[in-house]
């Protein structure tokens, strides 16, 4: 009787260990079922149309989980509810890690929609005049992008001692046109564009507002830390599935997709 009980116990332990190993495999480096955060905008759409089919051909099953904003997307990624996202640049991710105690890692730059100066009441950069009113985004990373772009246009000069990725309105040292700036939520800018002489908006806002990107009067020179990235948890960065996603973005199939479908919206990072 004791022998039977011992055998039964041993079998039960073996079964539990096997189940544990199976669970580890499902959640480990070689897993084939992946969950990603998604939102309305060009980046999720680009992934789903141009990258997802490449991964599915390799046997992956991919499930999108809708998120209301990027902060929520990073929280659920950091907590392990999703495996990756493709909607943020390095500057945003690093700010999240610092402010929220995150442990996220950027893997590879991916196509990015640049910020631009777009028409408001005026439709030509040459129409700039004293006292003109310009709308710019109010979140830190995109505010800096906006002022860097306005400097590129020659309308202001920023303190050269400051990092362009962190400049604010306070860093303007020359404003020859005495321009007025209103910093506001990016999503709200397109709806009030005719209240301003010019507006500065990011690519995702251009896309969501269905603004023709070819109407941009000037676009930014995208700094490396403002390129969109494939982002995962730090502990997953060496997983095979992460490499496969990165490889898909750099594949011949994806390049062909971009050549066919890029209508002037996307800046595509150069291969190193």
Where are these regions (language model features)?
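C-terminal motif of bacterial Sec signal peptides marking the signal peptidase cleavage site
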Residues: 15-20
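Short, polar/charged alpha-helical segment
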Residues: 40-65
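Short helix-initiation/N-cap motifs at beta->coil->alpha
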Residues: 64-75, 163-191
């Amino acid at each position: 009787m004791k022998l039977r009980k011992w055998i039964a116990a041993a079998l039960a332990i073996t079964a539990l260990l096997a189940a544990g190993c199976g669970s580890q495999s499902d959640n480990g480096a070689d897993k084939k079922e992946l969950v990603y955060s998604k939102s309305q905008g060009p980046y999720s759409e680009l992934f789903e149309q141009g990258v997802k089919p490449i991964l599915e051909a390799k046997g992956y099953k991919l499930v999108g989980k809708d998120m209301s904003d990027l902060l929520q997307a990073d929280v659920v990624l950091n907590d392990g509810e999703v495996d990756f996202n493709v909607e943020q640049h390095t500057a945003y991710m690093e700010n999240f890690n610092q402010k929220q105690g995150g442990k996220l890692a950027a893997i590879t730059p991916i196509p990015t929609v640049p910020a631009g100066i777009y028409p408001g009441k005026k439709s030509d950069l040459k129409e700039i005049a004293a006292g003109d009113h310009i709308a710019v985004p109010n979140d830190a990373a995109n505010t800096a992008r906006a002022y860097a772009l306005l400097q590129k246009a020659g309308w202001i000069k920023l303190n050269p001692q400051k990092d362009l990725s962190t400049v604010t309105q306070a860093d303007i040292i020359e404003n020859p046109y005495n321009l007025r700036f209103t910093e506001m939520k990016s999503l709200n800018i397109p709806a009030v564009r005719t209240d301003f002489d010019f507006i500065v908006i990011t690519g995702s806002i251009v896309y969501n507002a269905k603004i023709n990107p070819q109407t941009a009067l000037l676009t930014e020179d995208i700094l490396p830390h403002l390129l969109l990235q494939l982002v995962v948890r730090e502990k997953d960065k060496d997983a095979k599935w992460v490499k496969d996603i990165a490889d898909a973005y750099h594949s011949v199939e994806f390049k062909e997709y971009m050549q066919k479908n890029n209508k002037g919206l996307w800046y595509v990072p150069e291969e190193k």
